[in-house]
Structure formats: structure tokens, C-alpha cells
Amino acid sequence: MTHDKTCPCGSPKIYQDCCQILHLGLDSGAQLATSPEQLMRSRYCAFVLKNFDYIIKTHHAAYLDGLTLEQLQQGPHPEWLGLDVLSANDTTQPDGSKFGTVTFKAWYKMSGEIDAIYERSEFIFEQGRWFYTKGHQMHAKLPGRNDPCVCHSGKKFKQCCMKG
């Protein structure tokens, strides 16, 4: 990743000042995501960069359902186009436990077709950090020809990613 590019998570910051801090700080505990949204954005960025170790380590072990690092590495891997966070929240229960949700669309291209993962992800705060637990999939509708492009280029969809 070049130093002059904004972070894939959609932040205006460069990767080194954004998600890389979380990617590198996870094992040491030096820098952890402070909210479900920040964790979700850093996980999206990890998918873009194929940092599958981060994906596994931020996925709650009780919810992995047999998912392994090797499976993630196998592919095929899409070309990630952009991320739209639609809503995010976290709540603290009376017993002190914390839960959160993030609803997002992660746009990608695979085999020449554009699609999105449209999901309401669930998160839990345990052992001093946030973990992804599971997601509820929804159907994503492609933007109209004259709508802004999913890659956030500022161009119309028909003049950008829709072209091919």
C-alpha cells in the first residue's frame, strides 16, 4: 500500500495513521478498536489487504464455526471497491456487558460482476476489546446509473465501476 492513499476503510486518513495502527497493535494490545464501527472498518481494511490473520483474531472464537486462516487465504478474493457504513451503535447492559451492531455495505467486484455484502454485524466487548460475532445478511441493490459510484471516486456509477 502506498503512503499517499487514504485508508481503504473510508477514513480520510492514510492507512499508516488509521487501520494499520490497529492491525499492528492487536497482538501487543498497544492499540485496539474502541468501538464496533472502528473494528468493523479495520476488518474491512484487513480483507482489502488480505490480512486474514487480523480477521481471525478479531472474530470471537465461539462464533468461528470452523472458519480457518487457511480457508480465508484460499480465495477467490474479490476486488474491493468501497465501504458504506449505514449505522453503528453500542450499548452497555445493566450487568456491564457491552454489545454493538454495525450495518454496512461492502462493495466488491468478482468475475466482472459488482455486488455487495450488505450486513448487520454484531459485536461483543470481552477481555478489554471488541470482537465480531456474527452477521445478518441482507440483499443489496446496485446503485442507479447516475448515482454516485460505490468506490467513492466522486464520479457517477455509469462513468466509473459500472463501465467495467
Swiss-Prot record:
SUPFAM superfamilies: NTF2-like (SSF54427), Sec-C motif (SSF103642). NCBIfam families: PRK01752.1. PANTHER family: ADENYLATE CYCLASE-ASSOCIATED CAP C-TERMINAL DOMAIN-CONTAINING PROTEIN, UPF0225 PROTEIN SCO1677. Belongs to the UPF0225 family. This is UPF0225 protein Shewana3_2159. It holds the Pfam family SEC-C. Disulfide bonds: none annotated.
